Regions:
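Aromatic (tryptophan-biased) beta-strands that constitute blades/sheets of beta-rich domains
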Residues: 1-15, 38, 43-54, 86-95, ...
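Repeat-blade elements of multi-bladed beta-propeller folds
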Residues: 6-35, 52-78, 98-125, 146-182, ...
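Short, surface-exposed connector motifs at secondary-structure boundaries
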Residues: 187-190, 260-262
């Protein structure tokens, strides 16, 4: 059963992005445009112009504080008014790169990372969201801080816990068994509070489970990890648990146990 469909462009470069729902409307990016569609009919309600296309379309926009933040090619993030889809500002990263990491919002700032290549540097950044120059639709935004890492950041969505933001890095090699890192930084200053080594590129959003008070994440090397973050922003490394999903023939059952373990 197909209720409606809407063609937004042609060719793989215009493939629709992952969508989000904002105020009972569907937000989707395609080619160099961002659209607001009616959920029931698919009619285009608003259209906004983006300064670049997305990278493959699988990193969705993020909504927060009345704004939509679009991850775009060449290390760009563009902010839009969520009601009108008018552009508010544009961030251009100093090292550029593909915008492949989900955008996280917390207390007036967004956090995201970029990727250039397996063995090249890229930045993870904290960007203030305030529209400081409402007269300039493409106001050039600057990062509050940036963290540079060899190998960059790929699917590396962050989680904010209190005053700290936690995210992971690639391992800086072309294989899958190098040493990546999961980092805890002061979310306002970018000061590194702690780091834990992981096997392979850390390529997942960091998840937090309130019941177990644990962080969970995976790596390209085939590992599932779990550990706790202390109130001072350092990791409780005595709580670190690791599961090799490739080698463990009973991996799914053990993963369930790891997820349930407090």
């Amino acid at each position: 059963y197909e209720k409606w469909f809407k063609k937004l462009g042609s060719g793989w470069g215009a493939a629709p992005s992952v969508q989000i729902i904002v105020d009972n409307s569907l937000i989707v990016m395609s080619a160099n445009h961002i659209y607001k569609l009616d959920l029931n009919t698919g009619d285009i309600l608003q259209t906004g112009d983006m300064v670049a296309a997305t990278n493959f379309g699988y990193t969705p926009p993020t909504y927060a504080d009345g704004m939509i933040f679009a991850p775009l090619a060449d290390g760009r993030v563009q902010a839009f008014n969520a009601e009108t889809l008018e552009s508010l500002w544009v961030y251009q990263d100093t090292l550029k790169g593909q915008s492949l990491s989900p955008i996280t919002y917390s207390d007036g700032y967004i956090y995201t990372g970029f990727w250039n290549a397996e063995t090249k540097d890229a930045n993870y950044v904290c960007i203030p969201v305030t529209d400081e120059d409402p007269t300039n639709a493409q106001e050039a935004k600057e990062a509050a801080w940036q963290y540079t890492s060899l190998g960059g950041f790929y699917w590396a969505g962050s989680v904010v816990r209190g005053d700290y933001v936690v995210f992971g890095t690639d391992d800086g090699t072309s294989g899958s068994d190098g040493t990546g890192h999961v980092l805890s930084l002061n979310k306002k200053t970018g000061e590194v509070m702690d780091s834990v080594d992981v096997i392979g590129d850390q390529r997942s959003t960091i998840a937090y489970d309130k019941e177990t008070d644990r962080l969970y994440f995976t790596t390209k090397g085939g590992y599932l990890y779990s550990l706790k973050l202390k109130s001072d922003g350092t990791f409780d490394k005595d709580t670190l648990k690791t599961l090799n999903l490739y080698d463990d023939v009973d991996g799914f059952n053990n993963a369930a146990g790891l997820l349930a373990d407090k």
